[in-house]
Amino acid sequence: MATFKDACYQYKKLNKLNNAILKLGANDVWRSSTLTKRKGWCLDCCQHTDLTYCQGCLIYHVCEWCSQYSRCFLDDDPHLLRMRTFRNEVTKSDLENLINMYDTLFPINQKIVNKFTNIIKQHKCRNEYLTQWYNHFLMPITLQSLSIELDGDIYYIFGYYDDMHKINQTPFSFANLINKYDVLLLDSINFDRMAFLPLTLQQEYALRYFSKSRFITERRKYIETLHFSDNILNNLHNPNFTLQVIRNCSNMSVEWNKACNLIRNISDYFDILKSSHTESYNISPRCRMFTQYKLKIASKLIKPNYVASNHNSLATEVHNCKWCSINNNSIVWTDFRIKNVYNDVFNFIRALVKSNLYVGHCSSEERIYESIKDILNVCKENEWNMLVTEIFNQLDPIKLNEDSYVLLNYEINWNVMNVLINSIGKIPKILTLNDVISILRIIIYDWFDIRFMRNTPMTTFTVNKLKQLYEKDKTAEYDSGISDVE
């Protein structure tokens, strides 16, 4: 069993405060939940196991046992997970408060050691000091944490995480904040605690302490689509799809990093617990991460030969053509916005190709095809600009003075005409590289304006942010019939 989970189970019996705070789903009756093969550490009980997604943020960070309490590190409720979650700049004073909370909830003194020893020795075969029977005493106080960056905010979830070498398929990475504290002082605190333990347990305690207090902070991970619930990815192509999150809330009103101080006043803490309740929010999945995911899927279905074709149909409506017919059975086309972007982008590029290159049929092999395959991946701006520049140069532009120009004298559809008129003021006959980049951007931004999108979905917002957006009716953000811009 995980050391942190064992400690919570045993120390929960000490007093009323501990019984309220140290109650973990991992130590209660098991309830079934959706499991995946994603491996990592449950933030609630700190054990390494198979994880399921959290109902509060939809990220995989909770085990099947702890999921029954629906606790999230972004909650506004003073449960243990929230109280050991710190944000952004963590000061020495903040860490001192955390250590004091640990020492209050998991004390080690002669009275406590004798009490647990007597209980354990009531079993006939437990006269020896074996680690499996005294595992709760072997949790040192460290500044080990799992960290994650969400839209500019860095969160540190402190705890005692065993088996740091094991596989980690979550967006969290290990961070050691001992350098923000006093190393010798933390050593002294742990040596004082260790002194009350039997000699055979002291050695194990020391080994665990030094291994969890002297490690090097890992490089921070980037959160990706695979870190979120599979249910999101399966329904992402429905423009009407919304995400539902459930958050634990209360009338707790303290600075984010001061939540661990609440247990200093026990009566006030229990008053706050009485106000605990859950709130649910329906949230739009719109963000750069999920937009890029959808555009990447569409990119895999691209038939670049269309830009050399003479089809009268739109790019997604060509049938019975070996070189141009796309797979219309793909779920990505259920999002009409993807279809519109695909059709207009390829209508415009075809007009450029036909105006500047001598191509006559979609069966011809052209060098430009390779460059077109990633034209929808606009979320990586620098790479996309280089790609459009490459396409432009393959159109055999004419150089006059310092600028290069390409022709535009082939038919285009009404949507592209409107884009040209709105962006340039007319339908031009010659275009520069900047014009081509600008037009392609506007075609895509008309439906997926990544300039004004957050990187991760609103499921990673704090309760206060969600409440503010909900009051302004901005959590759903749009209906299926209008674009991101509108």
Swiss-Prot record:
This is Non-structural protein 1. Residues 1-81 are annotated as: RNA-binding. Residues 42-79 are annotated as: Zinc-binding domain. Keywords: Host cytoplasm, Host cytoskeleton, Host-virus interaction, Inhibition of host innate immune response by virus, Inhibition of host IRF3 by virus, Inhibition of host IRF7 by virus, Inhibition of host NF-kappa-B by virus, Inhibition of host RLR pathway by virus, Interferon antiviral system evasion, Metal-binding, Phosphoprotein, RNA-binding, Viral immunoevasion. The keyword RNA-binding applies. One of its GO terms (biological process) is symbiont-mediated suppression of host cytoplasmic pattern recognition receptor signaling pathway via inhibition of IRF3 activity. The lineage of its organism: Viruses, Riboviria, Orthornavirae, Duplornaviricota, Resentoviricetes. A motif (IKBKB-like degron (ILD) motif) lies at residues 479-483. The integrity of the zinc-binding domain in NSP1 is important for degradation of host IRF3. The pLxIS motif targets host IRF3 for degradation; however phosphorylation of NSP1 pLxIS motif is not required for its activity. Belongs to the rotavirus NSP1 family. It is found in: Host cytoplasm, Host cytoskeleton. Pfam families: Rota_NS53 (PF00981). It comes from Rotavirus A (strain RVA/Human/Indonesia/69M/1980/G8P4[10]) (RV-A). Plays a role in the inhibition of host innate immunity by inducing the degradation of key host factors required to activate interferon production such as IRF3, IRF5 or IRF7. Associates with components of cullin RING ligases (CRLs) including CUL1 or CUL3, which are essential multisubunit ubiquitination complexes, to modulate their activities. Recognizes the host NF-kappa-B regulator BTRC through the presence of a DSGXS motif in the C-terminal substrate recognition domain.
